């Protein structure tokens, strides 16, 4: 049994953020809500989402593993309007997920589910020496600057600063967020440094990780030298976690 009712706009944000990296995912449903984790096809990035039952207006669920074609679901959810109620309903006999948009007009779609062999993928428990909380808008702007120079980007923590750096054959880009400077408009909300660190990442993946964020969303970024970067943020009570493997420099 699985049936849930929620706001179309909020669910759309979660699905869009998840589908930027993966095409298929397993919804692990139980009485507490929905969890899901998946690796991208190249096994460079991991995405995890958690939607507790409290984010839904109505929720009923027992233990189910539901294999979802995220691309198909994303296209259907895109047809929903923000003022419509979204109803998700599992049809176990037909092996389909029914998606209903309800206002003064009712529209219903059905998505065929895929077989799930294993759904034990979890976000690894890694201890990081450093973390920052930063406004998504400021982080995304720094990525846009770096994109003018190279397709890889270095994230550095050093001397009370969070540095986003990119270097090409001739040009370079650097954005420095200085935690020692107090400013009402400071993009850094939190800065925790245990040791100096630097890691380099594929810029396209970082853009995908943050593509669905709003400017005022707060990103929690965990960093260490040559360690995967972990990025967390919330969407209307739902939690999204992304891990991206570093590019090992010779």
From Swiss-Prot:
GO molecular function, one term: DNA binding
Gene3D superfamilies, per database record: 3.70.10.10
SUPFAM superfamilies xref list: DNA clamp
Keyword annotations: DNA replication, DNA-binding
GO biological process: leading strand elongation; regulation of DNA replication
DNA-binding recorded as keyword: yes
Tree of life domain: Archaea
Quaternary data: Homotrimer. The subunits circularize to form a toroid; DNA passes through its center. Replication factor C (RFC) is required to load the toroid on the DNA.
Matches recorded under HAMAP family: DNApol_clamp_arch (MF_00317)
Function, in words: Sliding clamp subunit that acts as a moving platform for DNA processing. Responsible for tethering the catalytic subunit of DNA polymerase and other proteins to DNA during high-speed replication.
Family according to the record: Belongs to the PCNA family.
Name of the molecule in the record: DNA polymerase sliding clamp
Organism whose genome encodes this protein: Methanococcus maripaludis (strain C7 / ATCC BAA-1331)
Gene name for this UniProt entry: pcn
């Amino acid at each position: 049994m699985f049936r849930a009712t929620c706001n179309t706009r909020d669910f759309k944000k979660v699905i869009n953020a998840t589908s930027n990296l993966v095409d298929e995912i397993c919804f692990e449903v139980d009485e507490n809500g929905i969890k899901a984790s998946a690796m991208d096809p190249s096994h460079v990035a991991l995405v995890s989402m958690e939607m507790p039952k409290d984010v839904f207006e109505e929720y009923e669920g027992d233990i189910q593993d539901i294999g979802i074609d995220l691309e198909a679901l994303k296209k259907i959810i895109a047809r929903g309007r923000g003022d419509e109620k979204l109803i998700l309903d599992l049809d176990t006999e037909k092996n389909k997920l029914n998606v209903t948009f309800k206002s003064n007009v009712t529209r219903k779609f059905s998505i065929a589910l895929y077989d799930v062999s294993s759904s034990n993928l979890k976000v690894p428990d890694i201890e990081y020496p450093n973390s920052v909380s930063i406004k998504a808008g400021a982080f995304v702007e720094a990525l846009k600057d770096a994109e003018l120079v190279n397709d890889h980007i270095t994230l550095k923590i050093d001397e009370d600063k969070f540095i986003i750096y990119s270097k090409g054959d001739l040009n370079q880009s650097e954005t420095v967020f200085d935690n020692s400077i107090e400013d009402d408009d400071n993009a850094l909300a939190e800065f925790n440094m245990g040791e100096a660190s630097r890691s380099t990442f594929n810029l396209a993946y970082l853009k995908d990780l943050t593509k669905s964020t709003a400017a005022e969303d707060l990103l929690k970024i965990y960093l260490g030298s040559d360690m995967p970067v972990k990025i967390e943020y919330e969407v209307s009570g739902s939690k999204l976690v992304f891990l991206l493997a570093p590019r090992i420099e010779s």
